[in-house]
Regions:
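Register position in tetratricopeptide repeats
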Residues: 527, 563, 597-598, 631, ...
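Non-ligating segments of multi-cofactor redox enzymes
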Residues: 11, 18, 49-50, 54, ...
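Short coil turns that delineate tetratricopeptide repeat
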Residues: 511-512, 546-548, 582, 616, ...
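Helix-start (N-cap) detector for alpha-helical repeat units in TPR-like alpha-solenoids
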Residues: 457, 514-516, 548-552, 585-586, ...
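Hydrophobic/aromatic packing residues within the alpha-helices of TPR/SEL1-like helical repeat arrays
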Residues: 496, 503-504, 538, 574, ...
């Protein structure tokens, strides 16, 4: 007959095992069992009973603070978990830190909402505290709150690691919330581990923040100085100017929050798409403040199981005595759940000072051939969706491309593997695709197909834009008369045909309207002689635009209406343009022409005077004022404006000819003939040009 023993051990929360064995007792020794149960009920001890041989084996195998799972099922009596140390069903206690971090992240979200509400009510506020605003500083010299925040965050990361990411990022909060919801329905996100795609965030960061300055450095004709003149933009009245519209922001948050987490694992966007994390990851390698380990660690793995940053904590602390993965966002869950208090945060040597020669071996989700295929798919997907329809921002495109890469590689395996699963669903079994597999395949085809369609549309948008950029005729000359055809070069005619073809294909087969491409198509229509169609397209574009883009579409619409003789409609369109951008001086110049043609000459002169007061070097406006004053018999004022015009008019035959045509259209014939004559003096070939 087997001898039974009763043993009392402390809970894992005590980080120490009591190996006291009670005196031998028979299986039916109710007195001993009752005494042991009383001790166990106190919450300080766990009671295990069973054959003595099993307990001896268990005693050898159980590590300090970690309960052997085999013995749990051999008659273990588990007392209630203590309130100050809750335990989950899997034996890992809940993190105390997670609630504090959740509270901080919720507070960050509330601050963002309050920031927006304050701007809506007051009309002015602190500029967005968003790292992407740093691009405005580096390219235009605008010192804003986003630049200051990003700079301080990088400096803090250099010392303390990626605490800003783990405790202050609103996108990370969304991802953690989505991961929490998935776990609530029994789906634990599994990390997708890639060797190459982890470098995407750094590449994106260099593209956003370094490439523009590098391009100016290596380009002799780059736009502006290498280091711009810095100006104060800490306060703004257009808070949402650099953000996508709400209809775009919603799918952006869905893709970068839920979709990336579902397919790529917890914090999937941070790992494979976030450009700010590219810089934070580099800074983290230099940070001396890290998660470290003492000799009390017994490799139980609770830390890794709890980590939401997909860090193999138990392996890293074993190999390096600290966490060196730059993906660690210092959520501190691993420290909180460690049953032995073996993990702590403290100062010491940084990760960059650790030799990796004897380090851990990582398991990846894909093979090297699949890595190369995935990198190609990612690049193609990114180029396909970024900026398509003029809607998709860079960060959203990065998230979309990451998911496309995963789906492509998973589909490749689905079609080749005999056994494949995703979460708890079997995609293939015994070489046959299961129902879940067909569902996954259908979604993958839809997602990748949408990506391919976006790539087709984006190609035509890109080629149409290239043709637009190659147009050589100046706007002033093209708009000097209703039909610009006589002034078009053979290259311009070729580019007009190419541009029209590509933009029309993108428009006809696209799912959404690209208002920017529509404006360019309108310009092609005008140059090809269809001014009425151009006006219609500009009206459609303006309905879907805001700010400067809307102002420009309305300006060109009003200008073309002036050439068509529809002056009242032109004036209305130009007033709408000025309502969007009061500093659009060319719109004031054109509005003056509308008023002049409507017979409201004094109003026209007042508008032109307002324009030259804003910019005294406007050659055409000064010429218009000179002609207007002279036509009304005010020769002194007219001569003054004419002299000012002569000082700012380029002595180029083409420009003089353009001025002559504009003045002649307004009935200012004497001044017009002066410029025609000067153009012929500079180039006798202009005698054959139509006036």
């Amino acid at each position: 007959m087997a001898v039974w023993k009763i043993r009392i051990v402390c809970f894992p929360q005590k980080w120490k095992q009591f190996l006291n064995l009670l005196p031998n007792a028979s299986q039916k020794s109710s007195a001993s069992l009752r005494l042991a149960n009383q001790w166990a009920a106190s919450g300080k001890f766990a009671l295990h009973y069973g054959p003595a041989a099993l307990l001896r084996e268990r005693e050898k195998s159980v590590k300090s603070g970690c309960e052997d799972r085999r013995a749990k099922n051999q008659g273990s009596i588990q007392p209630p978990a203590r309130k100050n140390s809750p335990a989950q069903k899997n034996g890992i206690r809940k993190s105390k830190t997670s609630r504090w971090r959740a509270a901080v992240l919720i507070f960050v979200q509330l601050c963002m909402v309050a920031h927006i509400i304050q701007w809506r009510f007051m009309g002015k506020t602190i500029s967005p505290i968003e790292p992407s605003e740093t691009m405005q500083t580096l390219q235009g010299g605008a010192i804003n709150a986003g630049f200051i925040f990003f700079a301080v965050a990088i400096l803090a990361t250099l010392i303390f690691g990626r605490f800003v990411c783990g405790w202050g990022c609103h996108i990370l909060a969304l991802q953690d919330f989505c991961a929490w919801m998935l776990k609530k329905i029994g789906l634990t996100p599994k990390p997708f581990r890639s060797r190459l795609l982890v470098y995407v965030p750094l590449g994106a960061a260099l593209y956003m923040f370094v490439w523009p300055t590098a391009a100016r450095f290596f380009s002799s004709s780059g736009p502006g100085p290498l280091i711009p003149k810095f100006t104060n933009h800490l306060v703004t009245n257009n808070f949402w100017q650099t953000f996508p519209s709400v209809p775009v922001a919603i799918p952006f948050l869905i893709i970068c929050g839920f979709v990336t987490v579902y397919f790529l694992g917890s914090k999937g966007f941070c790992t494979y798409a976030c450009p700010y994390g590219g810089f934070f990851g580099l800074a983290d390698k230099l940070a001396p403040f890290r998660i470290r380990v003492t000799d009390a660690c017994n490799q139980c793995g609770h830390c890794t199981a709890t980590c939401t940053s997909n860090v193999l904590v138990h392996a890293e602390v074993k190999a390096y005595k600290m966490v060196v993965d730059p993906g660690c966002m210092k959520c501190m869950d691993c420290v909180s759940v460690c049953p032995n208090d073996a993990l702590y945060v403290g100062f010491g040597k940084p990760a960059i000072a650790v030799s990796k020669s004897s380090g851990k071996t990582r398991n990846y989700s894909v093979t090297w051939p699949e890595e190369i295929l995935g990198a190609a798919v990612f690049l193609g997907s990114l180029l396909s969706v970024r900026g398509v329809y003029g809607l998709v921002p860079f960060l959203m495109a990065l998230g979309y491309a990451s998911v496309t890469t995963f789906l492509t590689l998973k589909t490749w395996r689905l079609l080749r593997a005999s056994e494949l699963s995703f979460y708890r669903f079997n995609l293939t079994s015994s070489g046959r695709i299961q129902k879940a597999g067909w569902g996954f395949l259908g979604f993958s085809i839809f997602w990748v197909g949408l990506n391919a369609h976006s790539g087709w549309v984006r190609y035509h948008e890109f080629e149409g834009d290239r043709a637009f950029q190659r147009i050589q005729i100046p706007d002033e000359l093209a708009l000097a008369q209703t039909n610009p055809d006589p002034w078009l070069s053979p290259i311009d005619r070729e580019n007009i045909l190419e541009g029209e073809k590509h933009f029309q294909r993108a428009s006809n087969f696209g799912l959404f309207m690209n208002s920017e491409a529509l404006s360019k198509l309108a310009w092609f229509e005008y140059l090809s002689g269809d001014a009425e169609q151009s006006v219609e397209l500009l009206s459609q574009a303006a309905e879907h635009q805001k700010g400067q883009a809307r102002a420009l579409s309305l300006y060109y619409r009003g200008t073309i209406l002036n050439r068509l003789g529809r002056y009242e409609q032109a004036r209305t369109s130009l007033d709408e343009a000025l309502a969007q951008r009061g500093d659009l001086i060319l719109a004031r110049q054109e509005k003056g022409e509308s008023l002049w043609q409507l017979g409201r000459k004094e109003e026209a002169i007042a508008v032109w005077i307002d324009a030259v007061q804003r910019n005294a070097s406007l050659a055409l406006t000064n010429n218009l004022l000179a002609g207007a004053e002279q036509s009304l018999g005010r020769f002194v004022e007219g001569t003054a404006h004419e002299n000012q015009a002569d000082q700012s008019t380029p002595d180029v035959p083409l420009y003089h000819w353009m001025l002559g045509m504009r003045l002649k259209a307004l009935g200012m014939n004497e001044l017009a003939e002066k410029h025609f004559h000067r153009a012929i003096q500079l180039d006798p070939g202009y005698q054959e040009r139509p006036k």
